[in-house]
């Protein structure tokens, strides 16, 4: 039986688009919310808008540009992407998932929606502390207390690696759509991306692993 309604935190990338299709399978009614936070690859706003329109779901865009005023990172500033052993990559935006989920919860309550779907993933979390299961569960409790509302934060990708996320898209019948239409690349290139940035490397490695495993079955 499908649950009633859900709000998907949506960027138009591989993970959130897979979550959108997951939500459309499991819920009667789905809305999406995208955040404009001064990201360098602003194309993601247009991609998210386009995908939401194609799938016939209501799409909200919230202005979170203040993030760019108080943080310095490779996603909102014109600095080179760096990954150092033992350190959080400089693509990490302090407070992003915390703020996004909190504002998504405010919107969800106004829309009379209890379930919030997010594509955060601990398996491939790249050292990002706000992608951990313990963080999401803690925030879920905090939001319920803060707004006296029974939210449920759904994380369908939490324990999946990138190959398994591709598998889920395939199981949902959306493999080609996700492969061709989504934008994961830090340099704003849709589909296969630039093949150079960390996001593209992770996406491509997962794709190759899944296709290899699928070929053996």
From Swiss-Prot:
Record-level GO BP terms: queuosine biosynthetic process
Residue sites binding ATP per the record: 10-20
Highest taxon above the source species: Bacteria
E.C. number: 6.3.4.20
NCBIfam families: 7-cyano-7-deazaguanine synthase QueC
Function: Catalyzes the ATP-dependent conversion of 7-carboxy-7-deazaguanine (CDG) to 7-cyano-7-deazaguanine (preQ(0)).
Protein family: Belongs to the QueC family.
Protein name: 7-cyano-7-deazaguanine synthase
